[in-house]
Amino acid sequence: MSSKFDVVICGSGTAGLAAATWLAQYGVDCKILESRSGPLDVGQADGIQVRSVEIFESFGMAEELLREAYHNIEVAFWGSNPTSSGMGIVRKRSAHATTPGLSHMPRVILNQARFNEMWLEAMRRRNGQEVDYGHKVTKVTVDEEKATDPDAYPVTIVAQKDGQEQVFEAKYCLASDGAHSAVRKSLGFNMVGETSDSVWGVMDVFPRTNFPDIRKQCIIQSDAGSIITIPREGGSMVRVYVELAAGTNAKEVTLEQIQNASRQVFHPYALDVADVWWWSAYPIGQRIADHFSKANRVFLTGDACHTHSPKAGQGMNVSLQDGYNIGWKLASVLKGHAGPELLETYVLERQKVADVLINWDKVWAKQMCSIAKEDGGVVDANGKIDFSEVFVKAEAFTAGLTVTYGDSIITQAGDSNQQAATNLKVGMRLPAAQVVRFCDAKVMKTVNALPSDGRWRIMIFPGDIRQPSASTRLAQLGTYLFSNHGPIRKYLPPGADIDSLIEVIVILSGERLEIQQDQIPDAFWPTTGKYRMRDLHKIYIDDETYHNGHGHAYDFYGIDPERGAVAIVRPDQYISKVLDMKNHEGISAFFEKFLQKKGQANGSLNSHDEWTLA
C-alpha cells in the first residue's frame, strides 16, 4: 500500500528545508524523509554568506539569525615572516569580510545544526510541516509515460523504516540527501570531477592561545602550511582548517595530527587545545552531477548534485539557494498558477551556478595550498602567494551576489530596456536601496517590501508625480494594469485579493511632504484582507528621512526620474525584466509566457486547493 503526496523531499538538508519552507508558505503539504533518527545535532558548515542572510530576511527569520550568529566583520591575512629565525608568521594585511555596499546584510557564522533548526521552525510556523525521521530512502523511480500527465503521481519512492518497507507516490521529488544521494544513484546519475592529493583537517576547538587575531577570520600561509580560522558563535570556540602533509590519507588522519600541524603553522604563537567539539579530515575535490533532473519530476539539490572544498563557505549557502530556487516554482505549478515548463528553469539556472562554482573552487582551493606557488598562483613581489588579493577580488562571488540567471520564460534580458534602470540588472537579485514609506514615513529597504510570500512584483518608478508628465505616466499604467485585460486580473485566482499573485509597488521621487495621498491613483491603494481595508503600504518615496539621510534610490538603481522605469521581480527577488513606463504591453507579454489564466490551471493539488499566503 502506497501513500500519495504532491512533493516528497528525500533528506532534510539545507536545500530541502528551504524548498519545504516555500511549499509551506504556499500552503502545500509535502513529505520529508530523513534517514537520521532526529535533527542534525552537529553540523559541518558554519559560514553564512550575505545572500543567505538576505534570504533569511525575506522569510522574516533574519532577526533571530543575526542575534545568535557571530558577525564576521574583518579578515586578517598572515604569512611567513622573512626576518624571523626559523619558521614564523606575521600579519600582512587586514580587510573587510564583505565589501561595503555589496549588501545591507553582514556575513555571519552559525553552526549548520542551528541554521537548519531555524528552517524547521519556519516550516512549522507556516503549516505545521514536520520531518519524518528514521526513513532511509533506498530507491526512486519515474514512470516517464505518466510524467506528462499533470494529475499523475509518476514518482515512486521506496524507504525503509524500522525494518519495514514503505512506498510513497509523488507528483514531484527533491533529492536533498547529500553527497552520497540514494536518489541520484537510483536514477543512474553520476558525479563527474576529480579529487586532488591535498588533504585538510578541520576541528572546532576551544583554544588557549596568544595569537592576537583568534577572534577574527584568518588566512595564514606559512612555510609550514596553510590555515584558515573562523571564530564561532558564543565567543569561545574557533574552527581551524589546516593543510596536512603531502601524501596524507584522509581516512587515516588522527586528531593529534591535525593539532600538531596547526601548532606548526601558528608558530611562534602557542596553541593549546582545551577541548574539541568536532573534527574531521577530507581530501579536496570538486564534482558535479551529470544530470540535475529526471523527466521534470525529480530534481537534485545541494550536495546531491555538486560537491567542493568547504573552505570558502559555499556549500551550505549554494545548497540553500538551490532549495530557494526550486521551492517557489514547485508551489506555483502545484497551485495552478504556472505550467510545468516553469520547472525547467531550475536546471537552466542552478546547473550553471554549480558549473561556475566548481570551476572557481578549483582555483580557490589551489591558491590555499602550499603548492600553489609552483603552479603559477597569484604571488607578491617576493614570490609568495598573495591570497589577500584573491580573497578581496572574490568577495562578491563568495557573498552569493554575482549569480546572474540567463534568459528564459521568467528572465528576459533580451526583451528588456536595461537603459531604463542601468543598475537593476536583469537576472540578478534586486539590490536593496533605502526609501521612505509614504503612509507613515518609516525608513525601509526596498527588499523589505518584497518578502518571500510567493508573489510577483511589478515595481513602478514613475518619477516625481508633482510633474504632470510623471503623474500621467503613473495613472495610465495603473489603469492598464488593473483593467480586465491587464495582467493583474487576467491571472488572479478566483476569490483572491487583487494583490495575491501580482503585487504592484510604487516608488516615487520628490519631496514626500509636498505630495498628497489623493495625487496617487486609487488603484495603487487596493482594498484587501479580512476587513476589506485599503492597503497603504505599497507606496514609497525616494526622499530625505528624519534620521537616516537620503537613500538616493533612483541614482542607486540608475533610473532617470524624468523618464521613470518598471521592473518585474520574481518571488525569489531576482529581476525578470526592465521596461520603460510606456511599454504596457511588454508587461503583459512577460506574464503570458508562463502564468495560467483563470480556469486554465494544470492539474490540482492533493492537499490544499485554495490559494493561501501563510
Curated annotation (Swiss-Prot):
<feature type="binding site">
    <location>
        <begin position="6"/>
        <end position="35"/>
    </location>
    <ligand>
        <name>FAD</name>
    </ligand>
</feature>
<feature type="binding site">
    <location>
        <position position="282"/>
    </location>
    <ligand>
        <name>FAD</name>
    </ligand>
</feature>
<dbReference type="InterPro" id="IPR036249">
    <property type="entry name" value="Thioredoxin-like_sf"/>
</dbReference>
<comment type="function">
    <text>FAD-dependent monooxygenase; part of the gene cluster that mediates the biosynthesis of terrein, a fungal metabolite with ecological, antimicrobial, antiproliferative, and antioxidative activities. The first step in the pathway is performed by the polyketide synthase terA that produces 4-hydroxy-6-methylpyranon (4-HMP), orsellinic acid (OA), and 2,3-dehydro-6-hydroxymellein (2,3-dehydro-6-HM) by condensing acetyl-CoA with two, three, or four malonyl-CoA units, respectively. 4-HMP and OA are not pathway intermediates, but are rather shunt or side products.</text>
</comment>
<keyword id="KW-0325">Glycoprotein</keyword>
<dbReference type="Pfam" id="PF01494">
    <property type="entry name" value="FAD_binding_3"/>
</dbReference>
<feature type="binding site">
    <location>
        <position position="44"/>
    </location>
    <ligand>
        <name>FAD</name>
    </ligand>
</feature>
<keyword id="KW-0285">Flavoprotein</keyword>
<keyword id="KW-0503">Monooxygenase</keyword>
<dbReference type="GO" id="GO:0016709">
    <property type="term" value="F:oxidoreductase activity, acting on paired donors, with incorporation or reduction of molecular oxygen, NAD(P)H as one donor, and incorporation of one atom of oxygen"/>
</dbReference>
<feature type="glycosylation site" description="N-linked (GlcNAc...) asparagine">
    <location>
        <position position="260"/>
    </location>
</feature>
<feature type="glycosylation site" description="N-linked (GlcNAc...) asparagine">
    <location>
        <position position="602"/>
    </location>
</feature>
<feature type="binding site">
    <location>
        <position position="137"/>
    </location>
    <ligand>
        <name>FAD</name>
    </ligand>
</feature>
<keyword id="KW-0560">Oxidoreductase</keyword>
<protein>
    <recommendedName>
        <fullName>FAD-dependent monooxygenase terD</fullName>
        <ecNumber>1.-.-.-</ecNumber>
    </recommendedName>
</protein>
<dbReference type="InterPro" id="IPR002938">
    <property type="entry name" value="FAD-bd"/>
</dbReference>
<dbReference type="GO" id="GO:0071949">
    <property type="term" value="F:FAD binding"/>
</dbReference>
<feature type="binding site">
    <location>
        <position position="303"/>
    </location>
    <ligand>
        <name>FAD</name>
    </ligand>
</feature>
<dbReference type="InterPro" id="IPR038220">
    <property type="entry name" value="PHOX_C_sf"/>
</dbReference>
<feature type="binding site">
    <location>
        <begin position="239"/>
        <end position="241"/>
    </location>
    <ligand>
        <name>FAD</name>
    </ligand>
</feature>
<dbReference type="InterPro" id="IPR050641">
    <property type="entry name" value="RIFMO-like"/>
</dbReference>
<comment type="pathway">
    <text>Secondary metabolite biosynthesis.</text>
</comment>
<dbReference type="InterPro" id="IPR036188">
    <property type="entry name" value="FAD/NAD-bd_sf"/>
</dbReference>
<feature type="binding site">
    <location>
        <position position="319"/>
    </location>
    <ligand>
        <name>FAD</name>
    </ligand>
</feature>
<keyword id="KW-0732">Signal</keyword>
<keyword id="KW-0274">FAD</keyword>
<dbReference type="Pfam" id="PF07976">
    <property type="entry name" value="Phe_hydrox_dim"/>
</dbReference>
<feature type="glycosylation site" description="N-linked (GlcNAc...) asparagine">
    <location>
        <position position="317"/>
    </location>
</feature>
<dbReference type="InterPro" id="IPR012941">
    <property type="entry name" value="Phe_hydrox_C_dim_dom"/>
</dbReference>
<comment type="similarity">
    <text>Belongs to the PheA/TfdB FAD monooxygenase family.</text>
</comment>
<feature type="signal peptide">
    <location>
        <begin position="1"/>
        <end position="23"/>
    </location>
</feature>
